[in-house]
Amino acid sequence: MQAFTQLNGLVAPLDRANVDTDAIIPKQFLKSIKRAGFGPNAFDEWRYLDQGEPGKDNSKRPLNPDFPLNFPRYQGASILLTRENFGCGSSREHAPWALLDYGFRAIIAPSFADIFFNNCFKNGILPIVLDAEIVDSLFKEVEANEGYHLLVDLQSQIVQTPGGRHYAFEIDPFRKHCLLNGLDDIGLTLQHVDEIKAFEARHKAAQPWLFNES
């Protein structure tokens, strides 16, 4: 997993509340368990004018000109600004996979669905909770200023605007450690590989009949 320390990123606004995981990545794309390749189908039903299907050439599909993420000014955005209860619905981990593959490393909202919130950390995305009033002001600034960037500093737990305002956010210390060091569940396990091997050796010596290799 790629470490997250500091991000100076273009912000894209998605001014919708209660965006569920089926909107983030529709159910027909859930057959694959590979983490990569979902980006072109993120927000598929809002992003395109036709019905998306696995294996379809997205480069030839008609784009929805009214969907903000299709606006030229937001191409290359790495920070998503959205409304409350983002990521509600089913617990599919494909949702953060799709957002990460699209290019988002941070999501700012007044609140998130719990399972989606946890899945973001496991996949290298930083979900940031800010007060609704702050999110309102950020929406106004993003829409009024083309090329609007925010600086996200995880170590300091600060979001900084181009005008120099700072907004502090909370994060669990363990999750912060994992993001700063690029540790997913596998990475965390590998940190203890010596202890695991030692335990297995002791276990085999104490109960050899469980390890009959004949």
Swiss-Prot record:
Catalyzed reactions: (2R,3S)-3-isopropylmalate = (2S)-2-isopropylmalate
Subunit structure, as described in the record: Heterodimer of LeuC and LeuD.
Function: Catalyzes the isomerization between 2-isopropylmalate and 3-isopropylmalate, via the formation of 2-isopropylmaleate.
Pathway where it operates: Amino-acid biosynthesis; L-leucine biosynthesis; L-leucine from 3-methyl-2-oxobutanoate: step 2/4
Biological source species: Methylobacillus flagellatus (strain ATCC 51484 / DSM 6875 / VKM B-1610 / KT)
GO cellular component: 3-isopropylmalate dehydratase complex
Pfam family, one: Aconitase_C
Similarity comment: family membership: Belongs to the LeuD family. LeuD type 1 subfamily.
NCBIfam families assigned to the protein according to its UniProt record, in alphabetical order: leuD, PRK01641.1
One GO MF term: 3-isopropylmalate dehydratase activity
Record EC number: 4.2.1.33
Signal peptide region: none
Gene3D superfamilies per UniProt: Aconitase, domain 4
GO biological process, one term: L-leucine biosynthetic process
Protein keywords: Amino-acid biosynthesis, Branched-chain amino acid biosynthesis, Leucine biosynthesis, Lyase
Keyword Lyase belongs to the record: yes
InterPro entries: 3-IsopropMal_deHydase_ssu, Aconitase/3IPM_dehydase_swvl, AconitaseA/IPMdHydase_ssu_swvl, IPMI_Swivel, LeuD
Protein name, per record: 3-isopropylmalate dehydratase small subunit
